[in-house]
Amino acid sequence: MARILDNNVMGNEEFSDRTLRPQYLHEYIGQDKVKEQFAIFIEAAKRRDESLDHVLLFGPPGLGKTTMAFVIANELGVNLKQTSGPAVEKAGDLVAILNELEPGDILFIDEIHRMPMSVEEVLYSAMEDFYIDIMIGAGDTSRSIHLDLPPFTLIGATTRAGMLSNPLRARFGITGHMEYYQEKDLTEIVERTATIFEIKIDHEAARKLACRSRGTPRIANRLLKRVRDYAQIIGDGIITAQITDRALTMLDVDREGLNYIDQKILRTMIEMYQGGPVGLGTLSVNIAEERNTVEEMYEPYLIQKGFLMRTRTGRVATQKAYRHLGYPYQNT
């Protein structure tokens, strides 16, 4: 059941995400600090009739970075062209995209930290001075061509801002840190989604579902669909608090939003390593998960909720983790 709490987009969810996606800042639930800042920056750019400064959106998966990029484009009334770091394999791929931009357009690059360095370097002059120099030919016949670009806004999204090179990071004039959502905001998102898909759910059920969604709208919407299925087959189609509890228990999602893998990580640390410290590589081998999967998918939420600490000597399970899983805690 761990995939239910996977932050990555799955299968036909891309269509659902588009259906649920707010169009403007006033429709966007949560991320109040980021919204307040962007509202000012966007309005200032519009009054000056200028392109918005380049924007870097960073934070864990599923928190609305792509949605925010589309909202910014709608607020500015401009076109958005979308690609991703892994999709832009060669400098020529990026040059072709940049050459198609119209004045004021937004270029959105998801997973920008995964862009090859040779491609990234093309962005430096494009972002700073709106031009690129491209090499034509090879050997003695090669020559450089200067290509001017219209003013545009680059929006980069990343889950790993620390992997961006300093020259690239320095060229973003605006940064937006997308944080895990508060319970009240996630509850509102669940109720909004239920309204759009005509799902009957009471407020307490929506709150319970929000509490167990790891602070992530994408997970909240995914869980809502599975609880809807449960309510239709086991109940009368109406999602109540009791139905929600039963469905999420069936899905191995506990009251703190921890799934089977989360609990396996903590139990392994407590039972085999006396709570730690234990190295990430050793932990990954013991739970049969890839190192990057543990570090990017599971650890951030466990740390944010206070179940896990990163130290110089390794990962350590906290007293809260012991209590939550029913283990006696001894402070050694």
Curated annotation (Swiss-Prot):
Q: SUPFAM superfamilies in the record, alphabetically?
A: P-loop containing nucleoside triphosphate hydrolases, Winged helix' DNA-binding domain
Which residue spans traverse the membrane? none
Chain residues that bind Mg(2+): 66
Task: Read off the InterPro entries from this record.
Answer: AAA+_ATPase, AAA_lid_4, DNA_helicase_Holl-junc_RuvB, P-loop_NTPase, RuvB-like_N, RuvB_C, WH-like_DNA-bd_sf, WH_DNA-bd_sf
- Report the enzyme's class at the first EC level: hydrolase
Q: Which Pfam families match?
A: AAA_lid_4 (PF17864), RuvB_C (PF05491), RuvB_N (PF05496)
Q: Give the start-end ranges of region Large ATPase domain (RuvB-L).
A: 1-181
This protein's record includes keyword DNA repair: yes
Major subcellular location class: cytoplasm
As recorded in UniProt, its EC number(s) are 3.6.4.-
Q: Which residues bind ATP?
A: 20-21, 62, 65-67, 128-130, 171, 181, 218
Q: Which GO terms describe its biological process?
A: DNA recombination; DNA repair
State if tRNA-binding is listed as a keyword: no
Role description: The RuvA-RuvB-RuvC complex processes Holliday junction (HJ) DNA during genetic recombination and DNA repair, while the RuvA-RuvB complex plays an important role in the rescue of blocked DNA replication forks via replication fork reversal (RFR). RuvA specifically binds to HJ cruciform DNA, conferring on it an open structure. The RuvB hexamer acts as an ATP-dependent pump, pulling dsDNA into and through the RuvAB complex. RuvB forms 2 homohexamers on either side of HJ DNA bound by 1 or 2 RuvA tetramers; 4 subunits per hexamer contact DNA at a time.
- Similarity-based family: Belongs to the RuvB family.
Name of this chain's protein: Holliday junction branch migration complex subunit RuvB
Instruction: Specify the taxonomic lineage.
Output: Bacteria, Bacillati, Bacillota, Bacilli, Lactobacillales
Please state the gene responsible for encoding this protein.
Answer: ruvB
